[in-house]
Amino acid sequence: PTLTFLDSHVECCPGWLEPLLDRIARDPTTVVCPVIDVIDDGSFYFSWQNENGLQVGGFKWALTFTWIPIPERERKRKKFPGEPTRSPTMAGGLFSIDKAFFEKLGMYDPGFDIWVSYKLYFS
């Protein structure tokens, strides 16, 4: 079994889940996040990310989440663009994970009161 977490403001497009489940089936210790596209809140214009614009989660020394470009060493490590990208952290409310692996990691800490903490929790 797998678990998928989505923040309440997330909208999914057709076919978004299958690639995530495929990666978990190949390696149950992989935590997968979909590419996050943007829908403009004024015009509803859909902006999709191509491979060159992809970023990974990172954090500053003040432990605040930030998006960072995929490092060149990580781009070179990958054999093809669809291969998982290693990331120091991730968006905490938008991912899929093997249920047993999530439990092994300790699940979410019930003491966290706000969503901001989840971005760094599994890093």
Task: Please identify what each model-predicted range represents.
Residues 1, 26, 107:
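Active-site acidic short loop of glycosyltransferases
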Residues 2-4, 29-31, 94:
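Beta-sheet entry/capping signal
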Residues 3, 7-11:
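The conserved acidic donor/metal-binding loop of glycosyltransferases
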Residues 6, 35, 108:
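Conserved residues at the C-terminal ends of beta-strands
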Residues 11, 15-66:
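Conserved donor NDP-sugar-binding/catalytic core segment of glycosyltransferases
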Residues 19-20, 89, 93-95, 100-106, ...:
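A short, conserved alpha-helix in the catalytic core of glycosyltransferases
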Residues 64-96:
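A recurrent flexible, glycine/aromatic-enriched loop bordering the glycosyltransferase active site
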